[in-house]
Curated annotation (Swiss-Prot):
Reactions catalysed, as given in the entry: 5-methyltetrahydropteroyltri-L-glutamate + L-homocysteine = tetrahydropteroyltri-L-glutamate + L-methionine
Pathway: Amino-acid biosynthesis; L-methionine biosynthesis via de novo pathway; L-methionine from L-homocysteine (MetE route): step 1/1
Species of the source: Citrobacter koseri (strain ATCC BAA-895 / CDC 4225-83 / SGSC4696)
EC class (word): transferase
HAMAP family reported for this sequence: Meth_synth
CDD domains associated with the record: CIMS_C_terminal_like, CIMS_N_terminal_like
Cofactor binding note of this UniProt entry: Binds 1 zinc ion per subunit.
GO-annotated molecular function: 5-methyltetrahydropteroyltriglutamate-homocysteine S-methyltransferase activity; zinc ion binding
Encoding gene per record: metE
Residue pairs linked by disulfide bridges in the UniProt entry: none
Residues where Zn(2+) binds: 641, 643, 665, 726
Protein name per UniProt: 5-methyltetrahydropteroyltriglutamate--homocysteine methyltransferase
Binding site for L-methionine: 431-433, 484, 599
Function description: Catalyzes the transfer of a methyl group from 5-methyltetrahydrofolate to homocysteine resulting in methionine formation.
């Protein structure tokens, strides 16, 4: 029984973000469709070859996506919302982009599909929409075309397909209500057709992803798996693939399925290998996800070897990444600025492929010498002075309940804040960032490269902040922001100014569509050596009589959007960050900043996948936010912002944050999210987003008024704020001005109504 290795998927964007550049060039009309398709072909060929050269036996095909793999699956099934459909029913790459970006075939605006987090990762998928009586048919053959491509290049392939039950679970019903699970029998024929086509091509194994099997699914969804896979069996061998959690709670359901193998995440799950071996059919292949696909740390391969060695020779075994390497940067070797010691602790996607090759070879030969050599740096790290800071650990241990309590309850604070700011009804504001123009990005890049001295850089940033203030005053906004010209990314910026973080040059990972992020890495205890945001906030406030918000990224979001340490708990990291940012709140307040926004868009996405684990997480997540904010005086207004959120199941925790104002993303869901706040009788102020900043569409005054009137049916108008869904960093100034002008006009109309 020779052990083989494989990956569940590979990053799509390219080492230099070639896919992003090609997409954006095509969207701007500066490149042809053939240019775009050629970039995709080049990236796929390169990535297959790189994995093969690194020692991967079976290459994933179908993991590449032009925007998102769930959206690709929707097109495969012919599931295109009516507003995005071509008149002749055909589907092309522009159809796909219209769904993701919000356009009708005519070029007119049409709402983009809703976007939400892919399980508990930082990747976003486009939510499939289902309507009653919907028809499905094989419409988009990208998977088959790419399999042909890989086979022509001589590769051993393992096609990747999002499974039918998970696909339905991830979607939403639109229009008349019905049970979306009832569509299962309608999509299965398309899946069968795809598997038949793959079998014709000589494919032996298909990776069919069913990550929903790690969740606490309703019984009727669990029961749907057996008939679904009964219908799909017989064409090719199916590797039922799960990730992000363990499968033990649903193992009885899984073991009864007519598949030939199971992939389990042995990094994030608590599954016991011996129990899996005992309970799974003896003729099944077990794919052991031993190398973490969603972090940057080098694996201790001696530990991984020990974890799996007892079942070697007892069943067919593959070793694999825990999940797709989509969530990891591509190649550590191009990182030339990382300190040698720190660099020795890391492994990116290509290095993880190398780890899988080392592990496979050791398990096949029994010789662990290379594993021991590979693991030595990560073992030495445990004693590094770069990791431990006694002062931080002491401060964390001294936290009391008082440290997370504001001085007075909300009602008293609200009165103090009204007296201080005297804002009109329907106060208008934005979420924080303004367009990051080529000029701004060039300024930061020149400074970073050493082509610009600090004085010239600061003069340039000050000018952009001044412009942002002038623009906002001209538009008539009530509460202003400085625009964040100095910030490349809302998490990276703070990480750069906190001890305990390091940064990469090319550690890009895809967030959604063409958007990539470069998460910082938490390598040690976190502290703040000096104030971070105070100087620019103070400068912006000096330019206007209107209040300017101080802008902080909250502790849970910094944690969730960074690559965390693996040697301490997430709670410990979050509270260390909270203590550092608590000092920033105190310094902003002392500098005369009266409104401070602490963004926590990631609070919900950090939830464990199993509901039974939620309470413990929410308890420390809320406490971290409160530690961060509670130092503020009563007349300092604390705002928070959240996006991509379903709130109804965590309303207690949202209220427990005790923020004076919460702004939320609601426009894509047509204010549906406010229902949660209404039912809960949420006591504090709320700013429901009135337009979608992920789309270039400019909302009309009437559209915004209609949304605000809808909001006022659920939340008393005196507690409503008016704002976009999210920051405006990715937009251009022309559409930003137009959209905000309409937003301000809508608020003014409502004040006069």
């Amino acid at each position: 029984m020779t052990i083989r290795n494989h990956t569940l998927g590979f990053p799509r964007v390219g080492l230099r973000r070639e896919l992003k550049k090609a997409q954006e060039s095509y969207w701007a009309g500066n490149a042809t469709r053939e240019d775009l398709l050629a970039t995709g072909r080049e990236l796929r060929a390169r990535h297959w070859d790189q994995q093969k050269q690194a020692g991967i036996d079976l290459l994933p095909v179908g993991d590449f996506a032009w925007y998102d793999h769930v959206l690709t699956t929707s097109l495969l099934l012919g599931n295109v919302p009516a507003r995005h459909q071509n008149s002749d029913g055909s589907v092309d790459i522009d159809t796909l982009f219209r769904i993701g970006r919000g356009r009708a075939p005519t070029g007119e605006p049409a709402a983009a599909a809703e976007m939400t987090k892919w399980f508990n990762t930082n990747y976003h998928y486009m939510v499939p929409e289902f309507v009653k009586g919907q028809q499905f048919k094989l419409t988009w053959t990208q998977l088959l075309d790419e399999v042909d491509e890989a086979l022509a290049l001589g590769h051993k392939v393992k096609p990747v397909l999002l499974g039918p039950v998970t696909y339905l679970w991830l979607g939403k019903v639109k229009g008349e209500s019905f049970d979306r699970l009832s569509l299962l029998n309608d999509i299965l024929p398309v899946y069968k057709q795809v598997l038949t086509e793959l079998a014709k091509r000589g494919v032996e194994w298909v990776q069919i992803d069913e990550p929903a099997l790690v969740l606490e699914l309703p019984q009727e969804w669990l029961d749907a798996y057996k008939p679904a896979y009964d219908a799909l069996q017989g064409q090719v061998k199916l590797l039922l693939t799960t990730y992000f959690e363990g499968v033990t709670p649903n193992l009885d359901t899984i073991a009864a399925l007519p598949v030939q193998g199971l992939h389990v995440d042995l990094v994030h799950g608590k599954d016991d290998v011996a129990e899996l071996h005992k309970r799974l059919p003896s003729d099944w292949l077990l794919s052991a996800g031993l190398v973490n696909g969603r972090n940057v740390w080098r694996a201790d391969l001696t530990e991984k070897y020990a974890q799996i060695k007892d079942i070697v020779g007892k069943r067919d075994l593959w070793v694999a990444s825990s999940c797709s390497l989509l969530h990891s940067p591509i190649d550590l070797s191009v990182e030339t600025r990382l300190d040698a010691e720190v660099k020795s602790w890391f492994a990116f996607a290509l290095q993880k492929c190398g780890e899988l090759a080392l592990l496979r070879d050791a398990l096949n030969s029994g010789d662990t010498a290379k594993l021991e050599a590979w693991s030595a740096p990560i073992q030495a790290r445990r004693h590094s002075t770069r990791v431990h800071n006694a002062a931080v650990e002491k401060r964390l241990a001294a936290i009391t309940a008082q440290d997370s309590q504001r001085a007075s309850p909300y009602a008293a604070r609200a009165q103090a804040q009204r007296n201080r700011f005297n804002l009109p009804s329907w106060p208008t504001t934005t979420i924080g960032s303004f367009p990051q123009t080529t000029e701004i990005r060039g300024l930061r890049l020149d400074f970073k490269k050493g082509n610009l001295d600090a004085n010239h850089y600061r003069t340039g940033i000050a000018e952009h902040i001044k412009q942002a203030i002038v623009e906002q005053e001209r538009l008539g906004l009530d509460v202003l922001v400085h625009g964040e010209a100095e910030r490349n990314d809302m998490v990276e910026y703070f990480g750069e100014h906190l001890d305990g973080f390091v940064f990469t040059q090319n550690g890009w990972v895809q967030s959604y569509g063409s958007r990539c992020v470069k998460p910082p890495v938490v390598i040690g205890d976190v502290s703040r050596p000096e104030p971070i945001t105070v100087e620019w906030a103070k400068y912006a406030q000096s330019l206007t009589d209107k209040p300017v918000k101080g802008m902080l990224t909250g502790p849970v979001t910094i944690l969730c959007w960074s690559f965390p340490r693996e040697d301490v708990s997430r709670e410990t990291i979050a509270k260390q960050i909270a203590l550092a940012l608590r000092d920033e709140v105190a310094d902003l307040e002392a500098a005369g900043i009266g409104i401070i926004q602490i963004d926590e868009p990631a609070l919900r996405e950090g939830l464990p996948l199993r509901r039974s684990d939620w309470d413990a997480y929410l308890q420390w997540g809320v406490e971290a936010f409160r530690i961060n904010a509670a130092v503020a005086k009563d007349d300092t207004q604390i705002h928070t912002h959240m996006c991509y959120c379903e709130f109804n199941d965590i309303m207690d925790s949202i209220a427990a944050l005790d923020a004076d104002v919460i702004t939320i993303e609601t426009s894509r869901s047509d204010m549906e999210l406010l229902e949660s706040f209404e039912e809960f009788e949420y006591p504090n102020e709320i700013g429901p987003g009135v337009y979608d900043i992920h789309s270039p569409n400019v909302p009309s005054v009437e559209w915004i008024e209609a949304l605000l009137n809808k909001a006022a049916q659920r939340i008393p108008a005196e507690r409503l704020w008016v704002n976009p869904d999210c920051g405006l960093k990715t937009r251009g100034w022309p559409e930003t001005r137009a959209a905000l002008a309409n937003m301000v006009k809508a608020a003014q109309n409502l004040r006069q109504a």
